[in-house]
């Protein structure tokens, strides 16, 4: 049997961020439902499981000692402490999925994404934008869970966050979830065809073996 010129591609790490109300979660859910080769990265945390949460499904639940040990072993793409509990993205589990050819979505805040970018240089960083700030405002208001004070805080935060869009590889305007999903699918397809990704998967072949494969 003739050898393949290249191996099956390694999966792509897709890091998705954007302001609250931009529709990140809805887009990620649609991608997961539509594609069986796209998986969500499961975060690790030291907080106690809530009712109905399953270890390895909702989170990887760790003790603080276990979490700190993994920090020492450099096994997090990013991590942070929030209200006394640690949260992080396990590097080993993400790498395992990528090596298996799975595409991995990491939906994360901007600060976390920038930390991931320092370690995962081959990641694809996508910023989700609302069609307009007025539309973003209406989406947040429709949730019905915000006070006037918290609304103002969210709007100010959104303005600040949008300024980070230049740190990302791609920007996708979410005026329609279906269209936004199609744009991300196109980005993923293009990324898989990048020469630098293919080069990493090329088999080491002697010149005469390559000649035989191409011209026999």
UniProtKB/Swiss-Prot annotation:
Q: Which Gene3D superfamilies match?
A: Guanylate Kinase phosphate binding domain, P-loop containing nucleotide triphosphate hydrolases
Cellular component per GO, a single term: cytosol
Q: What is its EC number?
A: 2.7.4.8
Database matches in PROSITE patterns: GUANYLATE_KINASE_1, GUANYLATE_KINASE_2
Localization recorded for this chain is:
Cytoplasm
Cite the entry's keywords alphabetically. Answer: ATP-binding, Cytoplasm, Kinase, Nucleotide-binding, Transferase
One Pfam annotation reads: Guanylate_kin
Catalysis performed (reactions): GMP + ATP = GDP + ADP
Q: Where is the Guanylate kinase-like domain?
A: 11-189
Its biological purpose is as follows: Essential for recycling GMP and indirectly, cGMP.
User: What PANTHER family does the record point to?
Assistant: GUANYLATE KINASE (PTHR23117:SF13), GUANYLATE KINASE-RELATED (PTHR23117)
To which protein family does this belong?
Belongs to the guanylate kinase family.
Tell me what this protein is called: Guanylate kinase
The species this protein was found in:
Clostridium perfringens (strain 13 / Type A)
Gene this chain is encoded by: gmk
């Amino acid at each position: 049997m003739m050898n393949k010129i290249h191996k099956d591609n390694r999966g792509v790490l897709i890091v998705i961020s954007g302001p609250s109300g931009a529709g990140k979660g809805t887009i990620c859910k649609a991608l997961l439902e539509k594609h069986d080769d796209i998986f969500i990265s499961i975060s690790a945390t030291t907080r106690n499981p809530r009712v109905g949460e399953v270890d390895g499904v909702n989170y990887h639940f760790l003790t603080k000692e276990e979490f700190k040990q993994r920090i020492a072993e450099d096994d997090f793409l990013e991590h942070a402490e929030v209200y006394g509990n640690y949260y992080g993205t396990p590097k080993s589990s993400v790498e395992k999925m990528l090596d298996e050819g799975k595409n991995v979505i990491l939906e994360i805040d901007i600060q976390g994404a920038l930390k991931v970018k320092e370690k995962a240089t081959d990641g694809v960083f996508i910023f989700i934008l609302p069609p307009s700030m007025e539309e973003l405002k209406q989406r947040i208001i429709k949730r019905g869970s915000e006070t006037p004070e918290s609304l103002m805080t969210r709007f100010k935060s959104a303005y600040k966050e949008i300024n980070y869009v230049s740190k990302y590889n791609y920007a996708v305007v979410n005026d329609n979830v279906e269209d936004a999903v199609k744009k991300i699918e196109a980005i993923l397809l293009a990324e898989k065809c990048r020469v630098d990704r293919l080069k990493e998967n090329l088999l080491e072949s002697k010149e005469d073996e390559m000649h035989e494969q191409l011209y026999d």
